[in-house]
Amino acid sequence: MRSPVCCASLVLLLLPGVPSASAMAQTEVAIGGVKLDSELGVPGVLGDVDDGLEESADGRSDSKRRSWESVVAPIPSRNPAFGWMLSVPVMLMYKPSFAGPEDPVWISGLFGFYAENESWGAGLLQRMSFGGDRWRVTGALFRAEMNYEYFGIGGGGGASIVLDQDADLALVEGLRRVAPNLYLGLQAMYARTELGPQLPDVDLPPGLDPDRLRVDLTLATIAPRLQYDTRDNEFYPRSGLLVNASAAVSRDSIGADLDYERYKASMNHYLAVGNQGVLASRIVTQYTSDGTPFFLFPAFGQGADLRGYQMGSYRDRFLVAVQSEYRHRFTKRIGAAAFGGVGSVAPDFGGWEKSLWSAGAGFRFVLAPKNDISLRVDVARGRDETVYYVGVGEAF
C-alpha cells in the first residue's frame, strides 16, 4: 500500500463527515479519521501486534520465513463534528507465496468507528501488487451512517443545519507502471446514498433551501488516474516526490443519477534536513463541475489539507491549499512536528475572496521503528477555531 491510509486522502468524499485521512493506497479515498498504516507496532500501546515470524527447529527466528504481520489499534479522539469517537483499524500485511522480491506486501484491512453523535462506519480494504510492482490493484467496501453539520456553500457564515446521511460504497482501482516511478490506471466507484436535514429552530444559512438537501441518489464514476512516486519510504519519506491526479466522470450511461466531473491534483515533496529532520510540503487543488452534489464539493476539515477547520465549514466548487510541515526526531521513538498553510475555496477560478490559514504543532511516538510509523497527536488553529487530531501515520 503506497503510504497507506489514515483512513487525507477512504477521505470518503461521499461522506463529508468522515474525519481526515490520507489516501488509502494513494487511491485518494478515505475511511474514517485514522490511518490504517501498520507494521511491527508496540503491543499494549495501541493494540497488539503480531509479526507473523515463524521459528526454525532450533528456536531461532528466520527472517526468510516471515509470513505475515498484523496490527489492531483502537484510537479514541474528539473533534467538533462528531464529539468523542473511537476508531479501530485492523490490518493484516503479508506476501503471497508467488510474490516476487520487488512486490510490496499485500494488505487486507478492516476498519470501524463510532462517534458520540451516533455516527458510525465500517469498511473493508484489499490491496494487491503483481509483476514486480508493475500492477497495483486496490478494492474497498464501505458502509456508514453519519450526522454532520452543513454550513452552506462558501462558508464562514457560522449558521448550519444537521444532516443525516447513509451511504454504501464500492470502489476498485487498477494502476500499471508505464515508466520508472510512473503509474497510469482507472478508478471506478459505485455508491448509494440517502440524505436529509434535521431542521433546527435557528436561522438557516443564506440561500439555503432545506428541500434541496433531501436526496436519494445512485452515484457512479470512472476516473483516469496518474501517480508519480519517487519517495524513499512510503510510510515516512525523507526525500522524493509524490504526484497524484484524477478526473472522475459521472454519467447516466454508467448508472449514475447525475452528470458531473470532479478533478483533483496534488503534489507532495520531501526534503531531509540534517540527520533528524524532514521538511514535507504539499499543494493540492480540486474542482467540481456544474451538477455535482454539494456533499462532493471540495471542503476543508475532511482531509489533511489545512488542519484546524471543522469538517465542511468551508466548501465550494474550487479549492486550493499549500502547506508545509517540519518533522523532527529527538530519539528513535520520540518526535515532534510544526506545520502551517494557506488556502481558499471559491465558486470559480477568479472568485478567491477569503484567505484561510492554518498553523499547529504535534507530538510523534514511533510505534513501528522498522517502517517509521508513528502515533500522531496534533493541535491546529484555523481562522475560526482550534481542532485536535489523533491518528496513526503522518498527515501527508
Where are these regions (language model features)?
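Positively charged n-region of N-terminal signal peptides that target proteins for export
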Residues: 1-4
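Bacterial N-terminal signal peptides
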Residues: 7-18
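N-terminal periplasmic/intermembrane-space "pro-region" immediately following the signal or transit peptide
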Residues: 23-73, 77
